[in-house]
A protein has these predicted regions:
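Short, charged cytosolic
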Residues: 24-41
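A generic, lipid-embedded transmembrane alpha helix
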Residues: 1-6, 27-32, 132
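Active-site recognition of the HExxH zinc-binding catalytic motif
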Residues: 12-28
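Generic hydrophobic alpha-helical membrane-segment signal
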Residues: 7-8, 19, 48, 84
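Metalloprotease/metallohydrolase-associated module, dominated by Zn2+-dependent proteases
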Residues: 40-161
Length: 161
């Protein structure tokens, strides 16, 4: 109730900021050098030096950076009570879903860049991956969630052999 008036007044800017920040973080994770990031109420841009790829282009639609930031804090924290982290994970994931529903549409430049079918398939795959990590992390912690996810993924991939 305290932050709602601030959020409603600045919602367009905050969702655009989140979108561009996710592009920036994804490009840094891909070892590119950030050049600039501009954010306005209804549009923004992120420029970096290096190669682009589908992850950088579509990260804002499938990579909830604020939720992962909270998961990282949860990993580094000595606080044993998960309630505050669970609340923050819910709030940040809700914000990401709000951004996703507002920004994901067939005419979005990022989605058209790689083709709609490839883009939506990529987004769906990453949503499943992130949902499994986040849901498991809420109960068992991020470290166990990542280990479980990757062990399970490799086991399932190698099972036919």
């Amino acid at each position: 109730f305290i932050i709602r008036p601030f959020f409603r007044k600045n919602e367009a800017w905050l969702t655009t900021f989140s979108h561009e920040l996710t592009h920036a973080i994804a490009s840094i994770l891909m070892l590119n050098k950030m050049h600039s990031m501009k954010v306005y109420e209804q549009e923004g841009s992120t420029q970096y030096l290096g190669r682009s790829n589908i992850f950088i282009t579509l990260a804002p639609y499938c990579f909830p950076i604020f939720t992962y930031f909270i998961l990282l804090l949860m990993l580094l924290s000595s606080v044993r009570s998960l309630c505050i982290f669970q609340l923050l994970i819910g709030l940040t994931l809700g914000f990401h879903i709000l951004c996703f529903t507002q920004q994901t549409h067939p005419n979005q430049t990022d989605i058209k860049q790689n083709g709609k079918m490839i883009s939506y398939s990529f987004i769906f795959m990453w949503w499943l991956f992130n949902a499994s990590i986040i849901l498991y992390a809420v109960k068992y912690g991020i470290y166990r969630a990542v280990i479980y996810q990757f062990q399970g993924m490799w086991t399932n991939l190698l099972a036919p052999f």
